[in-house]
């Protein structure tokens, strides 16, 4: 290979390191904080089932808690959808745990 080709290859390999600005740690921390605030985090209490945790989170988000009487008789227990704005009923054996 000629001198020009080698120089061009080296330049193209080094160019992204020069052009791309380095992200500082303060900027990364700011991104992590804003991401953590955007996603609500809920922790379960000792001995609390997943269904109870989701129902409690649904109540704490301002949505009305679902009632078993709202459920279809064939469906079974009421289950508050974690990512849904309203409560809905699901068959408990269909919920992947």
From Swiss-Prot:
One of its GO terms (cellular component) is extracellular region. Coiled coil: none annotated. It is found in: Secreted. Residues 22-59 form a propeptide. Residues 1-21 form the signal peptide. Expressed by the venom duct. The keyword Disulfide bond applies. Contains 4 disulfide bonds. This is Teretoxin Tan22.5. It comes from Terebra anilis. The lineage of its organism: Eukaryota, Metazoa, Spiralia, Lophotrochozoa, Mollusca.
């Amino acid at each position: 290979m000629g001198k020009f080709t080698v120089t061009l290859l080296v330049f193209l390999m080094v160019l992204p390191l020069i052009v791309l600005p380095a992200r500082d740690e303060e900027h990364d921390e700011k991104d992590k904080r804003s991401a953590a605030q955007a996603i609500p985090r809920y922790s379960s209490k000792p001995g609390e089932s997943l269904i109870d945790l989701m129902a409690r989170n649904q109540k704490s988000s301002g949505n009305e808690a679902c009632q078993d009487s709202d459920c279809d008789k064939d469906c079974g227990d009421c289950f508050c959808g974690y990512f849904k704005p309203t409560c809905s009923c699901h068959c408990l054996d269909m919920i992947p745990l």
